[in-house]
Amino acid sequence: MENKVLFTDSVVANFCKATVDDNPIHDPEFMYSQNKGVVVPGMLLFSTIVNLLHRKTKEYFNYYKLIFGNVICTNEPIDLGFETKGEQNYLYAINGHDMFSTKNDRSVVMRNIEYKEFHPDGIVRTMPFHKTQLETFRELTNSFNNTLSDFLFTIAYASAALFKAIREPITEVETEINRLLNKAINPDQVSPFYQTLEIFRVNQHAELKFEGIIEYKIRFDREKANKTYVAQVACVHNNQCFYQSVYRLVAIPDKLIMRMVKDR
C-alpha cells in the first residue's frame, strides 16, 4: 500500500521543533544558502509510514528494522508506504531511489520477534517534553492513535538524547565521538549518519503523560575507532519501558552528505 506524499519546509521545521532536531540539513535557511534542498527527517518518514501500516492492518508489531540508504528532500512527491510479503512488511519512501533500502537489505516491520540480550549498563539521559510537542508530532505524522504515536515520538526524540550524550560526554567512547564530530577540533568535518536502527517494542500499552521526562539509557560501543559506533538505547517513561533499540552510526564527511542532497 502506498500514498503519494509531499513534505513542505514548514512541516519539516515544525517536526524538528517538536523533536528537538537541530541537524542543519533539515534547516531551510542553511540548506538554501548552500543551494541545496531541505532533507526530510528519516523519523518523519518512518512515523508516517508506520501510522499508515497500523491503520491498514490493525495489528501489533514489536520489531522494526530501519535501513538508511538515501535522503529525500522537501517539496518533491514521494511514494510512501509498505509492501507485505508473508510476515514481513517492507517500508519504502521512494523519489527516484528508496530511502529505506540498500542493494542488500530493506527496512522491515514484523511481529512476534524475540528480544535481543541488551547490556544492563548504560547512562541515563533525561529529556523533558510537553503537551505541545506531542500534539504537533501527532498532527504531522497522521497519527493512528495516541499510544502508537507516543511510541513513535519516543523513537524520534531519542536522536536528541543521543546527541546530548555526545555533546556532554561521560564515557571514553562518548568522548571519542565528541572529538570526532567537533568541527572546531577535527579538520575533517564529519557528521554522524545512521546506517541501521533496530527497535524492539516492549510494551504495546505504554503511553506518555501530557508532560514530563523520558529517560534514555544509552550505551555507546566502538566498532571501528573514529569511524563506526553502536548505541544501545532503552527508553523508559513513568517506570514503563517503551522499547529497546540498537543504532549503528557511521561518521561520514560533510561534503559527502551534501553531495547526496539534490541541488535546488
Model regions and ranges:
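HotDog/MaoC-like acyl-thioester-processing domains
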Residues: M1-N3, K58-Y63, I67-Q133, R201-R264
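Catalytic strand-loop segment that frames the active site of acyl-thioester-processing enzymes
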Residues: M1-V38, M110-E172
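A generic structural micro-environment signature
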Residues: A13, A18-D21, M31-Y32, L45-F46, ...
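Acidic/His-leaning functional-site neighborhoods
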Residues: C16, V20-H26, L45, T147-T228, ...
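General "foldedness" signal
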Residues: D21, H26-E29, L53, T57, ...
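Extended, compositionally biased flexible segments
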Residues: Q34-T74, E174-E198
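Hydrophobic, Leu/Ile/Phe/Ala-enriched alpha-helical segments that form helix-helix packing faces
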Residues: I49-T57, F82, T141, A158-I166, ...
